[in-house]
From Swiss-Prot:
Keywords: Cytoplasm, Pentose shunt, Schiff base, Transferase
Example of a GO biological process term: pentose-phosphate shunt
A GO cellular-component term linked to this record: cytoplasm
Organism: Rhizobium meliloti (strain 1021)
Family the UniProt entry places it in: Belongs to the transaldolase family. Type 3B subfamily.
Protein's recorded name: Probable transaldolase
Pfam families to which the protein is assigned, alphabetical: TAL_FSA (PF00923)
Record PROSITE patterns: TRANSALDOLASE_1 (PS01054), TRANSALDOLASE_2 (PS00958)
PANTHER family for this protein: FRUCTOSE-6-PHOSPHATE ALDOLASE 1-RELATED, TRANSALDOLASE
Record gene name: tal
Alphabetized SUPFAM superfamilies for the sequence: Aldolase
Subcellular locations according to the entry: Cytoplasm
EC number(s) stated in the UniProt entry for this protein: 2.2.1.2
Length: 217
């Protein structure tokens, strides 16, 4: 499974990338607002940190305007992945951009039917939102299962990018089901390493080692 981080905070991205954990980055207008920086400036810096795809989202809702924004975003760096909304215009733009050799991420997916359309449009990634479905008492993982089955049935190459991930259990369940990628906030990715028995065991080993009076180096 690939790990993307869902943030526009350069400090967090650099830290996770230095750990060797990152395969890519996803951003959106809300994260750009939170970062408080110019979209071109911050996206260019992010692209210089990570080698994998960096999703940068168009804000236009009409096809021709989407294509204009996509052209501007694609000039930022070679690893830009154009993020598009799951609308008819977004799918049309996805098809055109993919045919022209660009990576695409079709976002705001909440149904298997929508994911099927994204795959038909040739999307590099489709982003089903787990947490937001959970918020309305719908099991977001059921959507991941349905998409996985459909894509496997027909051999679609579009990668399932599990988004709106809020807990370490979301990451685990997405991995068990077979999502290709998970994108999560920095804190969630860091929390994957935590287990109380790991901390307890390390504490015991260190205490016992101190009693030996030895040094390794």
């Amino acid at each position: 499974m690939k790990f993307f981080v869902d943030t526009a905070d350069v400090k967090d991205i650099r830290e996770l990338n230095d750990l060797g954990l990152l395969d890519g980055v996803t951003t959106n207008p809300s994260l750009i607002l939170k970062a408080g920086r110019d979209i071109v400036e911050v996206t260019k810096e992010i692209c210089s940190i990570v080698e994998g795809p960096v999703s940068a989202e168009v804000t236009a809702t009409e096809y021709s305007a989407m294509m204009k924004e996509a052209a501007a975003l694609s000039k930022i760096a070679d690893n830009i992945c154009i993020k598009l909304p799951l609308t008819l215009d977004g799918l049309k733009a996805c098809k055109a951009l993919t045919s022209d050799g660009h990576q695409t991420n079709v976002t705001l997916c909440f149904s298997a039917n929508q994911a099927l359309l994204a795959a038909k449009a040739g999307a590099t990634f489709v982003s089903p939102f787990i947490g937001r479905l959970d918020d309305i008492a719908v099991d977001g993982m059921d959507l991941i299962r349905e998409i996985r089955q459909i894509f496997d049935n027909y051999g679609y190459e579009t990668e399932i990018l599990a988004a709106s991930v809020r807990t370490v259990n979301h990451v685990k369940e997405a991995a068990l089901i077979g999502a290709d990628v998970v994108t999560a906030p920095p804190a969630t990715l860091k929390a994957l390493v935590k287990h109380p028995l790991t901390d307890k065991g390390l504490e015991m080993f260190l205490a016992d080692w101190a009693k030996t009076g030895q040094k390794i180096a």
